[in-house]
Amino acid sequence: TIFINRELSWLDFNRRVLALGKDKNVPLAEQVKFLAIYGSNLDEFFMVRVGSLQERANLEQSKSKKEKRENKTNMTAAEQLAAIMPKTAQLQADCDKYYAKALEELAGCGYRKVDFDHLSKEDERFWKKYFQTELFPILSPQIVDSRHPFPFLRNKEIYLGVLLREKHPNAQSLGIIPISSQMER
């Protein structure tokens, strides 16, 4: 008997969590919480399960060994990864759509996401001062380019990745900014 793959079953579970993020029978604030739970679940899924599958697939490929099939589902690590990725891409597209809809509904309740360009002068001064006094002192951005290797990224930490344009056309570098756990969220 072949069973349902554990990883694919887990993605189905997280799809049900995501569905609560668009369920009109669930209060709006709770919908947003379910979207956050979905994201947190997916982060952990990639750190633990997808990470170990990737290691197994790489090991099997590098040793030119016959790929080991899971005895319950008869799938190799590479086959599991190939099944996970498109399913995850669709779930993430759905999450993005639900999040955009939730932002619209929150705006109807008086909550809105404001771009920096649309702040009042008073708010702009406040946030610039806040950045300079509270955030800037604890930021430690890192550049990744041909002279600077990719840094070690700690597990369960939050990072902001930024593409930096250089003076030369089509030249880009990657900037990585660790978001300190000292920062209030």
Walk through the language-model features, giving the residues of each.
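N-terminal non-catalytic structural scaffold regions of very large proteins
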Residues: 1-185
